[in-house]
Amino acid sequence: MDPYKHRPSSAFNSPFWTTNSGAPIWNNNSSLTVGARGPILLEDYHLVEKLANFDRERIPERVVHARGASAKGFFEVTHDISHLTCADFLRAPGVQTPVIVRFSTVIHERGSPETLRDPRGFAVKFYTREGNFDLVGNNLPVFFVRDGMKFPDMVHALKPNPKNHIQENWRILDFFSHFPESLHMFTFLFDDLGVPQDYRHMDGFGVNTYTLINKAGKAVYVKFHWKTTSGIKCLLEEEAIKVGGANHSHATQDLHDSIAAGNYPEWKLFVQTIDPEHEDKFDFDPLDVTKTWPEDIIPLQPVGRLVLNKNIDNFFAENEQLAFCPAIVVPGVYYSDDKMLQTRIFSYADSQRHRLGPNYLQLPANAPKCAHHNNHHEGFMNFIHRDEEVNYFPSRYDPVRHAERFPIPPAICSGRREKCGIEKENNFKQPGERYRSWAPDRQDRFARRWVDALSDPRVTHEIRSVWISYWSQADRSLGQKIASHLSTRPNI
């Protein structure tokens, strides 16, 4: 028997119990002891192996997005956008690409309820003919801060207090009181949208600004939008308490059960595009992740549909070991100078290497479905069998060559090295417009949630005053409403 023709299998098709090395086990119920009642012997390798494997079953959970659920399906192009991008998987209507999607909460632990007020992750991995494309977004279109330098501190503030492991409003409000750019995100998080009914009844967004490049090398900025065909549904406070109290995994179960019943969730993909030559024509910076692009002047363009029609086969292999990274793009899609995106390009891959090891892209859920070739090899948990003698490039013994060149954004970068903010902050206009677009009862719920948060006894008068000032600058009536319930005079 040639051992190299017999690869490790996930089928586990032996008719009897074995050790990891394949040795037969005749008793998987009893330890090896001295007599019927004697001490257990250390030589019971089967017991030692079984316990050692059990002790190492858990891997580090994601530092954010730990609680999640995945499903598989396909993406189908419905509208031609080849004038915008040379991406092969978007080449023509009718083209289908297999995908795996992971939905998640963001801040709380792996076993936390799915009814907490928290953004929801919406990450899509496209297995294209030109490699994988990871579109890693959320159910809300903007973010709290615009520069990734603040991201670790932001997560620390949102996470539980390190002293008592309790998430506390005073820490959150203290941190974000230094960053009025967060107001727009809070108009989503403290809105009814802050607690989706489940994963099927919410939209998704790429959040960051990317770039599309066509065959001629023309580049445009792009925002990605997923619109659910099931309609948006949310849970108000009393509903969330009831649902979460009955089943802390309700959204995971809803996704699984819906797909199992043939009720496949579906989203339509739209894009917004801006010519980089026109980026100075707006009262906001198109690369500012705390801003939305007004749809009345930058309309949504339809692209395709996402259908989830298959449940995952194994939660650990296809959810816990599933890894996304915004750096993973394909020809025709590229990054922008969005400061948060630039930070995520490094941070996500670095986090996955810590969590899963340097060869995490060899795991079946993360590996490309197309042919691939490079000299990245060895390292911890490398399980690809390779027998080549040439592991360098170039070589006259190996015919592998460079791929055909594909266009990337032609923009020229120049300027001084400096640490500074963007010029067009405009932190209050869009939050105010969003608040004024709501019905009165929705406005009241939003204000009440802020009053409740600011009523935390450890929130100081100074912090309350800062937030009332911020909301007054967004909308004077909102600031007055919050202040009146707190008996604090607006200071603007």
UniProtKB/Swiss-Prot annotation:
Gene Ontology BP annotations: hydrogen peroxide catabolic process; response to hydrogen peroxide
Major localization class: other
Residues spanning the signal sequence: none
SUPFAM superfamilies in alphabetical order: Heme-dependent catalase-like
Entry annotation: catalytic residues: 65, 138
GO molecular-function term, one example from the UniProt record: heme binding
Coiled-coil intervals: none
Binding site for heme: 348
Family note: Belongs to the catalase family.
The protein, known as: Catalase-4
Organism of origin: Glycine max (Soybean)
Gene behind this protein: CAT4
